[in-house]
Amino acid sequence: MVKKVAVLGAGSWGSILANMLVQNGNDVVAWTNMEEQAKELNEQHSNEHYVPGFKYDERLVATTDLEVALKDVDAVLFVVPTKVMRLVAQQMVEVLKKTGQKPIIVHASKGLELGTHKRLSEVLAEEIPSELRQAIVVLSGPSHAEEVAKQDLTLVTAASSDLASAEAVQKLFMNNYFRVYTNDDIVGVEMGAALKNVIAIGAGALHGLGYGDDAKAALITRGLAEISRLGVAFGANPLTFIGLSGVGDLIVTATSVHSRNWRAGNELGQGMKLDEVIDTMGMVIEGVPSTKAAYELAQQKNIEMPITEAIYDVLYNEKGVKEAIDELMHRDGRSELE
């Protein structure tokens, strides 16, 4: 039974999940590499930069000491940016080597590793001891930290090739407002989680340019087709993409003002440059590196992904958003099912 949990990463999603796990009756330590953030969580029970105005459960403990966070843990939850996932995993392994602990490894991050384009469970599997690899679990689905903080109803998926581990995570997180389903398609769940951020940037850009619901619905639908094509090429179950971690996560990310990726696209649509958007937001926009990864993976697999390619051109080749949309609309006609 899981009772002691280390949450690695105390941004908006990590800190809210940690808070919920405390309220579910678990002993939880949140790890951050920022002393001031740990102090704020411990003393003011707040995390103003990430979740303004929210008061955290006083039982939640934060630390910058990884050994303290990992002491006697039954489960480790990674909620760190993709660019540091491997580094944090390496640091965790060094601690676990000293203690001999064998916790369930869970991650709730969404993206692909920069450079290698590997899924995050693959990154973790390369770093952790072999006996822990089979039990890696991915927690993903349509979920905003702001809504979970308010205890709005949220449903997600726990995916793992090991059913017992997925069910342990399901039990750990379930409560009267947070429901968890299990899935054995870890590839599809992670691909859906990463690639929906790309389409969300496009949806935000449409809004920024003033396009209506028809255009946004079309982009989301055709975007889902692209996500599914690429995911299936890497071994995903196509049915996963019509589930919570596929279309569910895509809808919420591509339509909500809570979504950083949607907000970034909205600013781009209004004429702001990418560097300005990143500086203004001050938080990770996972869809930006995920767009590059998706574009390059599509080239590698010879998969047609015109929307992804258009967003790539806007982000990396300084193409105007309106020009990119016009080019998409003037592509040759074809069957919808191609």
From Swiss-Prot:
Binding residues for sn-glycerol 3-phosphate: 110, 141, 143, 196, 249, 259-261
Function: Catalyzes the reduction of the glycolytic intermediate dihydroxyacetone phosphate (DHAP) to sn-glycerol 3-phosphate (G3P), the key precursor for phospholipid synthesis.
Species annotation: Pediococcus pentosaceus (strain ATCC 25745 / CCUG 21536 / LMG 10740 / 183-1w)
Protein name per the record: Glycerol-3-phosphate dehydrogenase [NAD(P)+]
Lineage: Bacteria, Bacillati, Bacillota, Bacilli, Lactobacillales
Gene: gpsA
Residues at which NADPH binds: 12-13, 110, 145, 260, 284, 286
One matching Pfam family: NAD_Gly3P_dh_C
Xref: PROSITE patterns: NAD_G3PDH
Family membership noted in the UniProt record: Belongs to the NAD-dependent glycerol-3-phosphate dehydrogenase family.
Cell compartment(s), UniProt: Cytoplasm
Gene3D superfamilies found in the cross-reference section: N-(1-d-carboxylethyl)-l-norvaline Dehydrogenase, domain 2, NAD(P)-binding Rossmann-like Domain
